[in-house]
């Protein structure tokens, strides 16, 4: 056909050649309606997708949800959503912090990516949905199809428990499983990539036609001049301050660190976390290699690349956090009857892993294995995340951390945490550290600056609240601020004492309560202060206060939540069930937020 009789350009002809008969029929109707000046119905262009899927009856509506603590689950869910959009699927993408849990019963397809926090709990943003599904008012999900990917850490006993719980409960409530749940360890990329591919294929199989391009819109965006720093591409910052902020007699070593961000373009908000890529202690590496009788220059293969074992242990492999998988793998190579018996008992193995660093396994059960065998037993080294303790409104192009240095002894041998020890002991003044910002939209100050806030933290859990008050003061926020803080001793462990006193003088810390657990015979904790201040706390809640909790997930955060439920039930004259619902409503309204670890 010549161009004189065909008004379509060659590019359009090529595009049309790819369409199947059903899509051509639909496109014909669309074009006819346009020619008649009528509403053509479905919009075939999508700024965020390369295609729109057309079915004989109605398009698939897929909702991709994520429950993320550090951002990994969010990233995987974004990848899945983009893949589905590229295949023409109608996708709604939401993090659970912005999702109304009660609408779950209206969904057609739900694809959930969730991490796990604490002792197997759902991440903060996933709690409302978790509680709804496991509560008395759980919906009937007979019309739902679902798939779940869990992200976790095999070094913890409740590996991917949140994903397992969601997956099980969906099915119990009548939903149909689109495909089997997948569980991914810290090095989750390969598992996540396969799960995404399997999900895409399963969703495509559910559609009436194969995914194909109907129309595409390519929107050009201006290139960003600033480098996009991330976990995979960290910024190399200078450590400009390393100051111990606990007293000499304290049982704890807590450091205040400041990093220079000048010229980096790196941005963060109060409530975010900072990722730190640390290196393992060279002395620890030498101890390990000596025990295994391995030369530091012996070559090993990691992801298809060759490097010496010392370099691999320095910056590529996890050498401090023990796991059941490591001990089991080492037992097979060591051929030690006592160790073999130990790994045959799940409880004994879990207790041993919890109490024994990797290097001390080598002390307990000496064996001669190759450098490659040892490297194959270890997980990739991962960055450590710390709550940021500064506001850029106050400190400019700096970022501050408050870090408790992990120091302990095992069988008389001194051990140190990988990142805290790296920062405290091995990075010199103006030394370089690879860092990145991990946004935490689940821990944000209220947009309405007149709202009061209640900050509850213990130990280094005070870090984000220093950032919060710096931010509130910089913005001249009118809302009242109440700090409830706990630590061991007033004299040695009152972190940032002078700064809190200054906030009081400046009129930005209106109420404060402190729990010093070891300053009297009977231990007092922050949850005790919550109960003691029950009436005032309830009054603040009635005034619209936002409640923030930062600290240990396994004990402190649970005890604080139980205390809050007691206060709500007593002061609000509510049943335990109604108190639970009240607190869950606060959570959904972003008035109860936790940063726990």
From Swiss-Prot:
Keywords: Amino-acid biosynthesis, Cysteine biosynthesis, Electron transport, FAD, Flavoprotein, FMN, NADP, Oxidoreductase, Transport
UniProt domain Flavodoxin-like: residue ranges: 62-200
Xref: CDD domains: SiR
Example GO BP: sulfate assimilation
Highest taxon in the source lineage: Bacteria
InterPro entries: CysJ, CysJ-like_FAD-binding, CysJ_Proteobact, FAD-bd_FR_type, Flavdoxin-like, Flavodoxin/NO_synth, Flavoprot_Pyr_Nucl_cyt_Rdtase, Flavoprotein-like_sf
Transmembrane segments: none
Cofactor: FAD; FMN
Binding-site residues, FAD: 320, 354, 384-387, 402-404, 417-420, 597
Chemical reaction(s) catalysed: hydrogen sulfide + 3 NADP(+) + 3 H2O = sulfite + 3 NADPH + 4 H(+)
Metabolic or biological pathway, per its Swiss-Prot or TrEMBL entry: Sulfur metabolism; hydrogen sulfide biosynthesis; hydrogen sulfide from sulfite (NADPH route): step 1/1
UniProt xrefs under Gene3D superfamilies: 3.40.50.360, NADPH-cytochrome p450 Reductase, Chain A, domain 3, Nucleotide-binding domain of ferredoxin-NADP reductase (FNR) module, Translation factors
Binding positions (NADP(+)): 517-518, 523-527, 559
Any single GO CC term annotated in Swiss-Prot or TrEMBL for this entry: cytosol
Binding site for FMN: 68-73, 115-118, 151-160
GO molecular function ontology, one term from the record: sulfite reductase (NADPH) activity
Quaternary structure and partners: Alpha(8)-beta(8). The alpha component is a flavoprotein, the beta component is a hemoprotein.
Protein family per UniProt: Belongs to the NADPH-dependent sulphite reductase flavoprotein subunit CysJ family.
Protein name: Sulfite reductase [NADPH] flavoprotein alpha-component
Organism listed in the record: Mannheimia succiniciproducens (strain KCTC 0769BP / MBEL55E)
């Amino acid at each position: 056909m010549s161009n004189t009789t065909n008004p379509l350009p060659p590019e359009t002809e090529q595009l049309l050649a790819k369409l199947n008969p059903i899509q051509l029929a639909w496109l014909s109707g669309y074009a006819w309606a346009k020619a008649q000046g009528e509403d053509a119905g479905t919009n075939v262009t999508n700024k965020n997708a390369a295609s729109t899927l057309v079915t004989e009856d109605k398009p698939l509506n897929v909702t991709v949800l994520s429950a993320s603590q550090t951002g990994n689950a969010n990233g995987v869910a974004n990848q899945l959503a983009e893949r589905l959009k590229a295949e023409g699927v109608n996708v709604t993408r939401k993090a659970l912090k912005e999702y109304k849990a009660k609408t779950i019963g209206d969904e057609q397809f739900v694809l959930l990516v969730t991490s796990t926090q604490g002792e197997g709990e759902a991440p903060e943003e996933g709690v409302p949905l978790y509680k709804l599904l496991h509560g008395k008012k759980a919906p009937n999900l007979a019309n739902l199809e679902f798939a779940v990917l869990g992200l976790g850490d095999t070094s913890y006993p409740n590996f991917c428990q949140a994903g397992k719980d969601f997956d099980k409960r969906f099915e119990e409530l009548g939903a149909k499983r689109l495909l089997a749940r997948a569980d991914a360890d810290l090095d989750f990329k390969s598992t996540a990539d396969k799960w995404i591919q399997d999900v895409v294929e399963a969703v495509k199989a559910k559609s009436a036609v194969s995914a194909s391009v109907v129309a595409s819109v390519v929107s050009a965006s201006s290139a960003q001049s600033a480098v996009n720093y991330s976990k995979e591409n960290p910024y190399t910052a200078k450590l400009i301050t390393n100051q111990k902020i606990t007293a000499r007699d304290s049982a704890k070593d807590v450091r205040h660190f400041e990093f220079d961000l000048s010229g980096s373009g790196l941005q963060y908000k109060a409530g975010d976390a900072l990722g730190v890529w640390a290196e393992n202690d060279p002395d620890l590496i030498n101890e390990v290699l000596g025990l295994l009788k391995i030369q530091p220059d012996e070559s090993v293969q990691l992801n298809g690349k060759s490097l010496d074992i010392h370099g691999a242990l320095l910056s590529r492999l996890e050498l401090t956090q023990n796991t059941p998988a490591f001990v089991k793998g080492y037992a097979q190579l060591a051929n030690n009857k006592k160790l073999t018996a130990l790994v045959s008992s799940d409880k004994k193995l879990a207790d041993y892993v919890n109490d024994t660093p990797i290097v001390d396994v080598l002390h307990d059960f000496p064996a001669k294995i190759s450098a490659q065998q040892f490297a194959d037993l270890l997980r990739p080294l991962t960055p450590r995340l710390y709550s940021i303790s500064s506001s850029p409104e106050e400190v400019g192009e700096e970022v501050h951390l408050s870090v408790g240095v992990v120091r302990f002894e095992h069988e008389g041998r001194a051990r140190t945490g990988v990142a805290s020890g790296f920062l405290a002991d091995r990075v010199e003044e103006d030394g370089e550290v690879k860092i990145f910002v991990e946004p935490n939209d689940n821990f944000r100050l209220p947009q309405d600056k007149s709202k009061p806030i209640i900050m509850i933290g213990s130990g280094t859990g005070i870090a984000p609240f220093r950032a919060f008050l710096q931010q509130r003061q910089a913005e001249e926020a009118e809302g009242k601020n109440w700090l409830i803080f706990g630590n061991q001793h007033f004299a040695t462990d009152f972190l940032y004492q002078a700064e809190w006193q200054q906030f009081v003088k400046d009129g930005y810390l209106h109420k404060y309560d402190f729990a010093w657990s070891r300053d009297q015979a009977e231990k007092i904790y922050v949850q005790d202060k919550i109960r003691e201040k029950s009436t005032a706390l309830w009054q603040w809640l009635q005034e619209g206060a936002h409640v923030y909790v930062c600290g240990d997930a396994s004990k402190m955060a649970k005890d604080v939540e139980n205390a809050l439920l007691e206060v709500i039930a007593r002061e609000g004259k509510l049943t335990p069930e109604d108190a639970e619902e009240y607190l869950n409503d606060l959570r959904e309204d972003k008035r109860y937020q936790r940063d726990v670890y």
